[in-house]
Regions:
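PLD/PLD-like phosphodiesterase catalytic module centered on the HKD motif
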Residues: 1-226
Length: 226
């Protein structure tokens, strides 16, 4: 087992070294960011597929949401992490965001399937499983989100990081766990189309969804820092 603290060694660097042409990725995490994609763009372009599970409800329709979407600020903020979390947005240019989102959108359509946990009270553990062959695979446990901060590329506020990397055959237990959840249609929902639509909104200039999020971000920026 190898320990990654994102100080002496970084998750992003380890993934760059471990991903091969034809790799298969399985990720369970709270958020997915286009800037994490950009950081690993060369490597992610070589994979065969990515299966991604949002560990808590994301892009899930709720009855009351139809009545007044402004009451669902936490959900909107979580979904907005796809185009960069609040800390990433301060570091990245918004015009550059559209270009990255467009490139990421094409990649997602080719290689990614997104599902989400339906239950607020049953958050899943975060992890990454990387399979290169039948006898070469790695698992990364204790990965909260798929963002540049969790990759160790940008600074992360709060508690220190400690990710455990396991090699084959120990990594197989994580893939088995992921597969059991992935195939659970009762508790997961496929949101691939919703995510693709969100990407398209993000890179279309002056789209209503993009303006809506930026407005919310500016209004609640100080509140989110507390």
């Amino acid at each position: 087992m190898k320990l990654i603290d994102n100080v002496n060694n970084r998750l992003g660097d380890d993934l760059k070294e471990s991903i091969r042409k034809g790799s298969k990725l399985s990720i369970a995490a709270s958020t997915f960011s286009i800037y994490a994609f950009e950081a690993l763009k060369k490597e992610l372009g070589k994979i065969d597929e990515l299966r991604f599970i949002f560990s808590s409800p994301t892009f899930v329709e709720e009855e009351l949401q139809k009545q007044s979407r402004q009451f669902y600020i936490p959900n909107i903020v979580r979904e907005s992490e796809i185009c960069g979390g609040e800390f990433e947005l301060r570091l990245m240019n918004q015009l550059n965001q559209r270009a990255i989102a467009k490139e990421c959108s094409r990649w997602v359509k080719e290689k990614v399937t997104f599902k989400t946990n339906k239950h607020n009270n049953q958050m899943l553990n975060g992890m990454i499983h990387l399979k290169n062959s039948e006898e070469e695979a790695f698992a990364y446990a204790n990965v909260h989100s798929f963002t540049t901060s969790d990759l160790g590329i940008t600074h992360k506020k709060g508690f220190p990081t400690l990710i455990q990397k396991s090699n084959f055959p120990d990594s197989s237990a994580y893939l088995d766990w992921f597969n059991q959840i992935w195939n659970n249609e009762e508790d997961l929902k496929d949101v691939t189309k919703r995510v693709q639509d969100y990407f398209e909104s993000a890179y279309k200039e002056n789209s209503p969804e993009f303006i809506y999020f930026i407005t919310l971000y500016n209004i609640f920026n100080d509140f989110l820092d507390d």
